[in-house]
Amino acid sequence: KMKATREAFGNHLPVMGDKYDNIVALDADLGKATKIASFKEKHPDRFFQIGIAEANMIGISSGLSEYGYKVFLASFGSFLTGRYDIIRCSLAYSKRPVVMVGTHVGMAIGKDGVTQMGLEDVSIMRALPNIKILNPATYTEAIKVIEYLCETELDSPHYLRLGRQPVEDIEMPFEFGKGQIVKWGAYDEGPDITIFSTGCILGDVIDAAHLIDERTPNRVRVINFPTLKPIDREIIIESAKESKYL
C-alpha cells in the first residue's frame, strides 16, 4: 500500500501523546500540510499555534524543552532551514532535545515549486553541531522512528525529514544509527553492486536494483540509511570492501 511518511507523523504522534503527557506540538500555520494538526484534535492543551513565525517557534521550543517537555515542531523543511541562525544558537549549541520535523522534502512535491522544496536541508543540518538527522523511507519505518523519538531520553536536537508523496510501505527493522540491508542475493564473495539509499526514494532504488538484476541476477544489494547523522560508517566500510561498485 502507498502511504506518505508525513501521514505516519500525523497518525502516530497523537497516539504517543496518549502515552507521554510531556509531549507538546508546535505549529507554524502549516498543520494540515505537515499533519501535526492532528495532535490538536486529541491534545488541544498541548498544541500551540505559533503562526507564520518559524524563528519564534524554534525559540519557544528551546524554552519548553528546558522545563522537561518533549517538543515536536513542524514546518516545511525549506522554511525551517531558513531559520538557520536560530537553530544554531537556540538548539544546536545549547543541545536542546527538540524534534524538528521538516516535511515536503526533496523534489517530489513538483508543481509547488522550488521555493517549497527542502533541497538543502540535510547539508544545512549536518553542518550544525549536536544535531542528529533521521530520514525514514516508508510509512512503517516512520512510525518506528517516531516511537524511538518519543520513548528515548534525547540529549540533543533531532531533525526528522518527511515526504509528502505516497511511497510503497516496505516493512524493515529500525535501529538508530544503523543502515539496513533491504535487498540482497546469494553472493559467493559479496555483491557486485551495493546501492545506498535514504528516505522516500527507496522504492525507486529497489526498482532500479531489480532492473540491474535482470542483467546480472542476484548481484545487487540495497542498503537503507534511516539515520543520516550519525551515519553507519561500519556498513559503508564493509560494503566498500565487499562490493565491486558502490
Regions picked out by a protein language model, each given a short descriptive name:
Residues 1-161, 166-167, 178, ...:
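Thiamine diphosphate
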